[in-house]
């Protein structure tokens, strides 16, 4: 029989979170962002639950092809555009929209021979300083695209650097001002709102655009944790990583556990060994005290996470033993929830990373 570790994808939670975004921006169309294999959930596992979106957005053509193969006939957007000229042929054939963020991509379009016009999102670098044309160069890039017979439709986009951080509204306002100054009289749809801007600013006039691009919120993680929890935003966990107790040890005072003896018992302590380790995607740098649920009861990890196992304190769960359910993050069978953001905080990272890091050897199921 397989190891008891399992990742469960919750379809109802995905639908709930999508609707939560709809409520925040009722007048906008939604790109459901499924990059990084739907944040580690698996595109095929989330597609049915998210097909209520107006479009799907991702990074590469392989993911776009998978969405088309699942039967999606609506808009698909490549958020980073094409990576080489030959990608344009597949974009044309599969009717895939793509971002344009540099002169090279415009050059490739100009040289591309096609009978099907391309729909593009011209990206502005309004302050993120990763991809896009600066405000000073943006209109010239638009003019080049607008002159190309290969381009059927031009829309406009930018990406916020501080929507989830302390800069908050002032940071958003500065970037939006640059974006609006450069595009205010240009025809075409606009897209600016990421997860944090969509929930934190809602249907504010500053961020109201034709399209929003929710990502992490669809998967039940707070876009601005620890300022706000997922529960604050009425988001539900869409991924549960669970396993079982496969061994029980009784420690006495002075005994330690695991590599490096990083935890030493200060008195009698009952310990459970869990079939989950860093080779499954659980963060190795989670130390003693990382929250975990056993039979739906909150307790803590003990010592060092090893490749295939970790240890938990069974003191708060006296009825736990061999085979007891362990929830590493997500929803336990009794309905108790351990937010992925709390585990990520203990590991010094983000919920995004934990979702994406679940290893291929962990079986996935959909409920």
Curated annotation (Swiss-Prot):
Keywords: Isomerase, Pyridoxal phosphate. GO terms for cellular component: cytosol. InterPro entries: Ala_racemase, Ala_racemase/Decarboxylase_C, Ala_racemase_C, Ala_racemase_N, Ala_racemase_pyridoxalP-BS, PLP-binding_barrel. GO terms for molecular function: alanine racemase activity; pyridoxal phosphate binding. Pfam families: Ala_racemase_C (PF00842), Ala_racemase_N (PF01168). Its cofactor is pyridoxal 5'-phosphate. The modification N6-(pyridoxal phosphate)lysine is found at residue 35. HAMAP family: Ala_racemase. Belongs to the alanine racemase family. This is Alanine racemase. It comes from Delftia acidovorans (strain DSM 14801 / SPH-1). The lineage of its organism: Bacteria, Pseudomonadati, Pseudomonadota, Betaproteobacteria, Burkholderiales. The gene is alr.
């Amino acid at each position: 029989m397989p190891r008891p570790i399992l990742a469960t994808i919750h379809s109802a939670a995905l639908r709930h979170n999508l609707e939560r975004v709809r409520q925040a921006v009722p007048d906008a169309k939604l790109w459901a962002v499924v990059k990084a294999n739907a944040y580690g959930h698996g595109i095929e596992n989330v597609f049915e639950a998210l097909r209520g979106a107006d479009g799907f957005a991702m990074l590469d053509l392989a993911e776009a092809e998978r969405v088309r193969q699942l039967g999606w006939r609506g808009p698909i957007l490549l958020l980073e555009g094409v990576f080489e000229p030959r990608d344009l042929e597949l974009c044309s054939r599969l009717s895939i929209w793509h971002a344009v963020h540099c002169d090279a991509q415009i050059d490739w379009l100009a040289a591309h021979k096609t009978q099907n016009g391309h729909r593009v999102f011209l990206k502005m670098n309004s302050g993120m300083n990763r991809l896009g044309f600066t405000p000073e160069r943006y209109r010239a890039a638009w003019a080049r695209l607008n002159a190309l017979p290969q381009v059927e439709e031009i829309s406009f986009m930018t990406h916020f650097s501080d929507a989830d951080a302390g800069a908050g509204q002032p940071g958003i306002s500065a970037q939006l001002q640059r974006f609006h100054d450069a595009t205010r009289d240009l025809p075409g749809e606009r897209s600016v709102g990421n997860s944090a801007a969509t929930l934190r600013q809602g249907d504010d006039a500053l961020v109201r655009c034709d399209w929003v691009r929710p990502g992490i919120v669809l998967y039940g993680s707070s876009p601005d944790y620890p300022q706000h929890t997922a529960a604050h935003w009425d988001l539900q966990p869409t991924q549960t990583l669970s396993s079982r107790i496969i061994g029980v040890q009784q420690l006495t005072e002075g005994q330690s556990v695991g590599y490096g003896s990083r935890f030493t018992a200060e008195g009698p302590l009952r310990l459970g060994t869990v079939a989950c380790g860093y080779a499954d995607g659980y963060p190795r740098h989670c130390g003693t005290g990382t929250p975990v649920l056993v039979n739906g009861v909150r307790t803590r990890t003990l010592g060092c996470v090893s490749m295939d196992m970790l240890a938990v304190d069974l003191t708060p769960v006296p009825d736990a033993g061999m085979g007891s359910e362990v929830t590493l993050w997500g929803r336990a069978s009794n309905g108790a929830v351990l937010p992925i953001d709390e585990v990520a905080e203990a590991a010094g990272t983000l919920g995004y990373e934990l979702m994406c890091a679940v290893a291929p050897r962990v079986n996935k199921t959909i409920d």
